[in-house]
């Protein structure tokens, strides 16, 4: 199975919008990718984290103890909402840092950009909405 950053790189490497949509749709069952796309482009989500990259120690990639394909489930504790309402700020930020330190460094970069809601180069909101019509509100 590919890392999330590899899936995004595959989409970025295609030139035509139709091809980008097709590549995204080929990963329809990968919820980690869909969560990253939604977290990046859904402006109704509010990340309850400081902006930018926190101080964390990236692992070497080849020895990442976890994978974003499983760890994306922790996103619910990082946004303002029901799951995170009783979570102290320090605990939330430590959870975020632990997540970043446990996944591949390039996936950690994807997560940092997502929580800053920084657009993904080569993967526009329009393309995401066409690939997954019900993922992001228009």
What are these regions (language model features)?
Residues 1-138:
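N-terminal nucleic-acid-engaging modules of covalent nucleotidyltransferase systems
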